[in-house]
């Protein structure tokens, strides 16, 4: 007799294999796509006195990433100029950030966000943690390849020179993208062993055996770890998130918390990040933009439903209240609708 959790886990696995991720994206390929026509319309919009931002937003937020690459190619053929640099000159502020982000491939976007998080003085640990903890093996391997292509250095090298201690070890291990893939066989003995090892390495003893935590949480498959965290509760008086808060501090604590939340429910993790970026006074636009751009073709529909379920109001509604102008329009198109 399978438990509900196993059935859900199996469904989510099968779902992930049989349903392309884009099925949960809010941005789909445009049906009557014509790259030449789009390139011409964007060229006209850029040349318009005062710049016709509405046309630029309408076109680029309603095309798939692949289609945007075709538009950029057609634009360069037409004008002998790069679309990205033409738009950089024509736009400004948060809208510019969104539009330039949409022109990059997903791996280029992640690579450039990672580079920016480690450039200059200080590290933007939040961005580094979010990307490294939430991307799949395949995505991470592609990011590593593109990062080297773009910056002529290894992502791992940059992480090593920009971080330290156990936090560095965790980031380096995750960035390799070598986690076991979800299999169809459930190994109950290993689930139990891992749960006990996590408990023995942390809450049960004085001090924390961080390398043990790192090896289990970066090497096992997502589905396996979901079961491990469930099982963990039968050994520990605290769940995994509470244990992390008790055992480690600083960037390491932050990274483990992000990682466990991503493993437990990735769309909910992003829904929480989006909520945090807009709650209270002011908006953390950097976080908001990065998620809206990077998840729009991956799992935005799932993120929206988790957001509505947890916060009682739609993501669309929150964005409407928190942003304005063509920047708002661009984000709402990426959101893909109200719930």
From Swiss-Prot:
Compartment list: Secreted, Extracellular space, Extracellular matrix, Basement membrane; Melanosome
Query: Where is the stretch described as S100A10-binding site?
Result: 2-24
Q: Where is this cross-link: Glycyl lysine isopeptide (Lys-Gly) (interchain with G-Cter in SUMO1)?
A: 49
Question: Any idea which residues bear Phosphoserine here?
Answer: 26, 184
Which Pfam families does this entry report, sorted A to Z?
Annexin (PF00191)
GO terms for cellular component: AnxA2-p11 complex; basement membrane; cytoplasm; endosome; extracellular region; melanosome; nucleus; plasma membrane
Record keyword Calcium present: yes
Which SMART domains would you find in this protein's record? Answer: ANX (SM00335)
Q: What does this protein do?
A: Calcium-regulated membrane-binding protein whose affinity for calcium is greatly enhanced by anionic phospholipids. It binds two calcium ions with high affinity. May be involved in heat-stress response. Inhibits PCSK9-enhanced LDLR degradation, probably reduces PCSK9 protein levels via a translational mechanism but also competes with LDLR for binding with PCSK9. Binds to endosomes damaged by phagocytosis of particulate wear debris and participates in endosomal membrane stabilization, thereby limiting NLRP3 inflammasome activation.
Question: Could you share any additional remarks the record makes about this protein?
Answer: It may cross-link plasma membrane phospholipids with actin and the cytoskeleton and be involved with exocytosis. Treatment of cell with antibodies against the protein reduces classical swine fever virus infection.
Q: What does the UniProt entry state concerning the protein's domains?
A: A pair of annexin repeats may form one binding site for calcium and phospholipid.
Please identify the protein, giving its name as recorded: Annexin A2
The species this protein was found in: Sus scrofa (Pig)
